[in-house]
């Protein structure tokens, strides 16, 4: 029946005498807020994984012990790091090594990292294997990684990703050391008259070389495919690796092509990894392999004649005959220090490289002779707009 005024007043008084009711209501609201916050955080993590996932593509064959070191170092990163998926491309390991690789893949998968093992027997072709991995990748970025790379620092990938996401950046590389040392293996590729080389290779990283070349992030003509990060859309826009370059210079050719498309290639120098160089395919020093190397280098320059002996990121006043970066004055060489701009040279018919970026310079480096010596340097302004803007 209907409640009378007395009963209503009594219930109201009982509620007022129960102070825990207010706290219970507040606790339920707080619990709901926590649940909503957790759900929102999970949705944000899923979105982050979808938007920024890096697909790590690793070509490998008959190398499970070294591969294991690579995979474990890759997955030992702190919580909250850029998420990865791994695509392992095997072009024909023997049965014993295939089983070892499958066990390794299961270990990595059980530990929580998505990994896919693609076993497709074929002759070794680095470009084909990388392109195959890129076809299967779901990530917004692609990291091409040799199976003999050992990662050493927690935030190396996050740092590389932050650079690769910049709209004008093509590929991003990492400083590489020889195992258990600070001896440089890769610090960006330089294109010299003898061909593409790793400047500062075999040199100790215990000092700063020319203007901090081994200390700061640098633009370069290309980075090594042993550890190369690139946005998926840019890689596909470029058309992937050229499969006619089966072993060597495929990474350099990609770097040349990215420059021609208007992108920069960058080497990140404040993080490093170890490179147990070429353990998968062996040495390149046999006569047959040296012949192949020469042939692929010539093919590279047939594809990009304007780059033969030219590197827009390497000063002409530095050594162009070896791996060090010492200054070589113009009077000791036959070079012309007043050559026309790089993008106007080398193309048939005299056409310019229209898409190469011609940004204003950020720094003017001027070296002068001291009173005790004459070095014979020439100062060439390369960006009059920038220099005039700072005259005052």
Give the residues covered by each predicted segment.
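Non-catalytic membrane-proximal stalk/linker segments that position and tether the catalytic domains
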Residues: 1-52, 293-298, 306-367
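Acidic donor-binding segment of Leloir-type glycosyltransferases
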Residues: 75-119
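A recurrent flexible, glycine/aromatic-enriched loop bordering the glycosyltransferase active site
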Residues: 127-128, 193-230
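Short aromatic/hydrophobic "clamp" motif used to bind/position activated sugar donors
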Residues: 142
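Conserved donor NDP-sugar-binding/catalytic core segment of glycosyltransferases
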Residues: 153-193
């Amino acid at each position: 029946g209907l409640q009378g005024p007395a009963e209503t007043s009594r219930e109201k008084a009982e509620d007022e005498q129960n102070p825990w009711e207010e706290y219970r209501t507040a606790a339920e609201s707080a619990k709901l807020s926590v649940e909503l916050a957790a759900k929102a955080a999970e949705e944000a993590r899923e979105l982050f994984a979808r938007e920024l996932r890096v697909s790590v593509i690793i070509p490998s064959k008959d190398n499970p012990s070294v591969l294991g070191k690579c995979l474990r170092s890759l997955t030992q990163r702190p919580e909250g790091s850029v998420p990865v998926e791994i695509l392992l491309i095997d072009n024909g390991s023997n049965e014993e090594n295939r089983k070892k690789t499958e066990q390794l893949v299961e270990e990595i998968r059980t530990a929580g990292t998505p990994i896919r093992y693609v076993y497709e027997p074929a002759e070794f072709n680095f470009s084909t294997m990388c392109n195959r991995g890129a076809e299967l990748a779901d990530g917004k970025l692609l990291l091409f990684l040799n199976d003999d790379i050992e990662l050493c620092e927690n935030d190396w990938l996050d740092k590389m990703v932050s650079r690769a996401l910049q709209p004008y950046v093509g590929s991003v590389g990492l400083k590489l050391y020889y195992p258990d040392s600070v001896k440089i293996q890769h610090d960006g590729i330089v294109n010299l008259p003898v061909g593409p080389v790793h400047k500062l290779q075999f040199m100790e990283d215990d000092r700063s070389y020319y203007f901090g070349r081994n200390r700061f992030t640098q633009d370069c003509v290309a980075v090594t495919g042993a550890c190369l990060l690139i946005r998926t859309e840019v890689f596909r826009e470029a058309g992937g690796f050229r499969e006619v370059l089966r072993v060597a210079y495929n990474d350099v050719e990609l770097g040349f092509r990215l420059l021609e498309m208007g992108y920069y290639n960058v080497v990140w120098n404040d993080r490093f990894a170890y490179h147990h160089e070429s353990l998968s395919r062996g040495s390149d020093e046999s006569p047959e392999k040296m012949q192949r190397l020469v042939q692929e280098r010539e093919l590279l320059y047939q594809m990009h004649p304007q780059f033969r002996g030219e590197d827009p990121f390497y000063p002409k006043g530095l050594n162009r005959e070896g791996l060090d970066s010492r200054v070589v004055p113009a009077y000791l060489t036959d070079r012309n220090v007043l050559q026309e701009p790089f993008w106007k040279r080398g193309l048939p018919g005299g056409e310019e490289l229209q898409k190469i970026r011609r940004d204003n310079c950020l720094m003017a480096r001027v070296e002068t002779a001291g009173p005790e010596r004459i070095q014979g340097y020439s100062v060439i302004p390369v960006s009059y707009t920038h220099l005039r803007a700072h005259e005052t």
